[in-house]
Amino acid sequence: MNPEHSPLGKATVYAAQYDASLLFPIPRAGAREQLGIAAALPFFGTDIWNAYELSWLNARGKPQLAVATFYVPAESPNIVESKSFKLYLGSFAQSKFDSVDAVRDVLKRDVSAACGASVSVQLVSPHDFGKLQMEELDGLSLDRLDLDTDVYEPDPSLLSAAADEAPVEETLVSDLLRSNCPVTGQPDWGSVQIHYVGPQIDHAGLLRYIISFRNHTGFHEQCVERIFLDILQACKPLKLAVYARYTRRGGLDINPFRTNYNQSMPDNARTARQ
């Protein structure tokens, strides 16, 4: 399915009852082919979706609510278009379910089917909201650099690394990531964390490269995969992990993570802007 056929940018009709058919899958293959990715992925990882506007009725008609988190594996053949995800979650509002577990099971079944892979689902009930974390991405901030730039389309030539020096291990972060929805043109604001082991990456060039996404159109997942591949090819790190946390839209935030080495899942802690 093409993004142009999704609910994005079209008049919205809210479903009166639960409707799994609202989910609109988009194949990852098209964007990956443009990046030169063949069948064998050069990374693995997860897309972490947080949903803050999930509510349903219990068996007696009383509204219930939860914050939902979906863990979509990067190897899944599809992503779900975000507005369709919002409409799908909204369709639960006037539908009755016997328990929280029943809601979780339905969410897992439907989203897994749309993505074409097993998706993990967690629901946090109101009595546990106090346990939800908020913290900034850990690492050395690139935004401290005072520099000039005029490149606002992705340009990997901005990237360089000191290949003739000893390898280093660094974690670098920036809050200056911005890209744009390929269907509506709406800006997507995010923060990005880059951890690597290898030749030291030029910090100013990396920040200019991150800023260069400012006028780029692409879904969150596609932007992170492009960042990962450009750094991998231009700087040749031995190990690389890229994690972005995008601000919320329509009650959803999307947080893609890509890596080429075994490590634990990054913390799903909201940043201040989320």
Swiss-Prot record:
- Could you give a single Gene Ontology term from the biological process aspect? queuosine biosynthetic process
Q: What is its EC number?
A: 1.7.1.13
This protein's major location comes to cytoplasm
What keywords would UniProt list here?
Cytoplasm, NADP, Oxidoreductase, Queuosine biosynthesis
Annotated signal sequence is none
Give one Pfam family.
Answer: QueF_N
- Superkingdom in the source lineage: Bacteria
Q: Which residues form a coiled coil?
A: none
A Gene Ontology molecular function term for this protein is: preQ1 synthase activity
GO CC annotations on file: cytoplasm
Q: Where does NADPH bind?
A: 82-83, 249-250
The pathway where this protein functions is: tRNA modification; tRNA-queuosine biosynthesis
Q: Which residues form the active site?
A: 181, 188
Q: How does it assemble?
A: Homodimer.
Q: What family is it from?
A: Belongs to the GTP cyclohydrolase I family. QueF type 2 subfamily.
Q: Its biological function?
A: Catalyzes the NADPH-dependent reduction of 7-cyano-7-deazaguanine (preQ0) to 7-aminomethyl-7-deazaguanine (preQ1).
| The protein's name | NADPH-dependent 7-cyano-7-deazaguanine reductase
Origin species, per record, is Burkholderia vietnamiensis (strain G4 / LMG 22486)
Write the gene name.
queF
